[in-house]
Amino acid sequence: MEEQGMGIRVEAMSPEYAHQATAWAERLGLPLQDDAAGFAVQVGADGLQIQQLGPQAPGPVRVDFVDGQAAHRRQFGGGNGQMIAKAVGIAQGVRPQVLDATAGLGKDAFVLASLGCQMTLIERQPLIAALLEDGLTRARSDDEVGPIVGRMRLLTGNAIERMRNWEGEAPQVIYLDPMFPHRDKSALVKKEMRVFRPLVGDDLDAPALLEAALALASHRVVVKRPRKAPIIDGPKPSHSLEGKSSRYDIYPKKALKA
């Protein structure tokens, strides 16, 4: 048997999803057959998911804004008192327009949208963007979550280029959560990180990301970092909000007002 590699194939979970699988394969430029693939983009009743293949592989990764972790955080996450809410400047009468330039699976953007912020998301990795698009599409039909994801607009491509060539009104706040090269072991075992790492790699362009964000944002830039990680090379943040495992470095440009 061939060793599991870095290749990616698309597969239908059952015959009725073969047409959708073919459509995604064409769109993503991926094969429907690859016995040596290390990953599979699977299409089924629960939408789109990425499954790492092989005997030690963790479970699938998908975007679900309606049930599970997202639902729990929406109901019990602490509302406007959450650190991320304070970091982006949510306050009484203030719901900034936020650009999440490193969207990933959209968890932080969804939290901010659920608190009333108009969100624009950028995701550079086409597979992750596909998961996000699929999750947003499914969530739109939910009575409770539909209005929240209605505040989330997804863009794909290189966030640095997107920000440098921005058209229209600048976002008030830009939120960055770059991949960090040396997560501690407990975080590394999270299945999402195990799947993400080989597909996405580290964001070694974090200083350029910060520079582009500072040039574009009208009011502030917020950078999420592991708690003990160094600040990104470049201008120093004015202050930080620190939690148990992560912190938010805040780069203000002007005050957000109601």
Swiss-Prot record:
Binding-site residues for S-adenosyl-L-methionine, renumbered to this chain: E123, R124, D177
Assigned EC number: 2.1.1.242
InterPro entries membership: 16SrRNA_methylTrfase_J, SAM-dependent_MTases_sf
Protein's UniProt keywords contain S-adenosyl-L-methionine: yes
Enzyme class: transferase
GO cellular component terms, A-Z: cytoplasm
Compartments where found: Cytoplasm
Region (Disordered): 232-258
Biased segments, Basic and acidic residues type: 239-252
Gene3D superfamilies recorded: Vaccinia Virus protein VP39
Keyword field contains rRNA processing: yes
Reactions catalysed according to its record: guanosine(1516) in 16S rRNA + S-adenosyl-L-methionine = N(2)-methylguanosine(1516) in 16S rRNA + S-adenosyl-L-homocysteine + H(+)
GO MF term (any one): rRNA (guanine-N2-)-methyltransferase activity
Key words, A-Z: Cytoplasm, Methyltransferase, rRNA processing, S-adenosyl-L-methionine, Transferase
Family membership: Belongs to the methyltransferase superfamily. RsmJ family.
Function: Specifically methylates the guanosine in position 1516 of 16S rRNA.
Protein name (database record): Ribosomal RNA small subunit methyltransferase J
Source organism (scientific name): Pseudomonas putida (strain W619)
Gene: rsmJ
